């Protein structure tokens, strides 16, 4: 039996009718909700590139694919205790302040160390800080600051410390399941629109908990339910890899950050860098590591060299040389930035997505 062939017939009259109907609908929407409430994406003003703020880590900026964390988005930074979550958030605040941005810190944990923040480059005189009593109060303050349109970066530290009022007023040991998850879900529904309109970056720091009875897959989960996983444009998993020592004295941690979710660039890239006690992210350490990956810094045995000039024997000596010679460090950084694509490819080579990554990143 012969199959009948389908023939597409162009009907210019139908196309004109559709165009008129769309124009009428657009005009009606703009009258009802205001000009700019709906538009054609490719027409009118030029589509803006994603605005970003540096994380303070050159390697992480490259791994994020757009040169930093995107503005007007929700960001989640999570990981085990003492892995560098707050340090990374404070570095982002410091970078925003360098550009003249106004920043706020909602300290739900009541644990911010102003001395350490100042060492990381944070201008405490211009930093707005709040230490709320309840989760509802913290999120109301967050909503008010975001709606003001004057805040560039706002950090909430942490989701786990956003205790609902009902839990605080109740007795110790009372079972009230789902309170925090419902609180976060409602808050994010309200916040997401104003965050986009005000172009404010909101960073939620989160903690890790263990799921009971998990036989297969990772038993780890983050607090506050699933809403934050869905609303976050970028999710960063930060882990301590090792402790750095000078002889027997601990001087810092080597940490690994994995981009678990990224809505503005390819995800699953990971990068390692040093966080030194009392200093924060070691920029000179990153220049050496990224320079070696990009072929800019040569490594021969234990010796590091750049442009036929020896930097030092051993990584710590090379870091000390760059610290004492900022002009050479600046030239290496400029060369790395010129080869960001190559460095990003090298970073991606080391990141093999797992089933857990796809589960978390799909949110």
Swiss-Prot record:
UniProt xrefs under SUPFAM superfamilies: P-loop containing nucleoside triphosphate hydrolases, RecA protein, C-terminal domain
Molecular function GO labels: ATP binding; ATP hydrolysis activity; ATP-dependent DNA damage sensor activity; damaged DNA binding; single-stranded DNA binding
GO CC annotation: cytosol
Keyword DNA damage: yes
Keyword DNA repair applies: yes
Localization of this protein: Cytoplasm
Pfam families (UniProt xref): RecA (PF00154), RecA_C (PF21096)
Residues that, per the record, bind ATP: 79-86
SMART domains associated with the record: AAA
CDD domains: RecA
Gene Ontology BP terms: DNA recombination; DNA repair; SOS response
Keywords: ATP-binding, Cytoplasm, DNA damage, DNA recombination, DNA repair, DNA-binding, Nucleotide-binding, SOS response
PANTHER family: MITOCHONDRIAL DNA REPAIR PROTEIN RECA HOMOLOG-RELATED (PTHR45900:SF1), RECA (PTHR45900)
Family membership noted in the UniProt record: Belongs to the RecA family.
Purpose of the protein: Can catalyze the hydrolysis of ATP in the presence of single-stranded DNA, the ATP-dependent uptake of single-stranded DNA by duplex DNA, and the ATP-dependent hybridization of homologous single-stranded DNAs. It interacts with LexA causing its activation and leading to its autocatalytic cleavage.
The name this protein goes by in its record: Protein RecA
Record organism: Methylobacterium nodulans (strain LMG 21967 / CNCM I-2342 / ORS 2060)
Classification of source organism: Bacteria, Pseudomonadati, Pseudomonadota, Alphaproteobacteria, Hyphomicrobiales
Protein's gene: recA
């Amino acid at each position: 039996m012969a199959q009948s062939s389908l023939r597409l017939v162009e009907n210019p009259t139908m196309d004109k009718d559709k165009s008129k109907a769309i124009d009428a609908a657009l005009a009606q929407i703009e009258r009802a909700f205001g000009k700019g409430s709906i538009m054609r994406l490719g027409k009118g003003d030029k589509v803006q590139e994603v605005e970003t703020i540096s994380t303070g880590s050159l390697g992480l900026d490259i791994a994020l694919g757009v040169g930093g964390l995107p503005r007007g988005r929700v960001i989640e930074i999570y990981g085990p205790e003492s892995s560098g979550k707050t340090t990374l958030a404070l570095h982002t605040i410091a970078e925003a302040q360098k550009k003249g941005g106004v920043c706020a810190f909602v300290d739900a944990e009541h644990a911010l160390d102003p001395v350490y923040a100042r060492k990381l480059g944070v201008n405490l005189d211009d930093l707005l800080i709040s230490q709320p009593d309840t989760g509802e109060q913290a999120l109301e303050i967050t909503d008010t600051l975001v709606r003001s349109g004057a805040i560039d970066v706002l950090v909430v530290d942490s989701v786990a410390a956003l205790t609902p009022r009902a839990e605080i007023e109740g007795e110790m040991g009372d079972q009230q399941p789902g309170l925090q998850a419902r609180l976060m879900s409602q808050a994010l529904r309200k916040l997401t629109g104003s965050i986009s309109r005000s172009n404010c970056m909101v960073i939620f720091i989160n903690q890790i908990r263990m799921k009971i009875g998990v036989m297969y897959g990772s038993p780890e989960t983050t607090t506050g339910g699933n809403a934050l996983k869905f609303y976050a444009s970028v999710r960063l998993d930060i882990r301590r890899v090792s402790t750095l020592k000078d002889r027997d004295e601990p001087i810092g941690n080597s940490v690994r950050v994995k981009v678990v979710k990224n809505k503005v660039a390819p995800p699953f890239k990971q990068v390692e860098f040093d966080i030194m006690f009392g200093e924060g992210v070691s920029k000179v350490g990153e220049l050496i590591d990224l320079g070696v990956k990009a072929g800019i810094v040569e490594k021969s045995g234990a010796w590091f060299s750049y442009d036929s000039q020896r930097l030092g024997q051993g990584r710590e000596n090379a870091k000390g040389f760059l610290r004492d010679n900022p002009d050479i460090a600046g030239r290496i950084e400029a060369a790395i930035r010129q080869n960001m694509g190559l460095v990003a490819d090298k970073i991606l080579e080391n990141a093999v997505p797992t089933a857990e990554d796809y589960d978390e990143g799909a949110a």
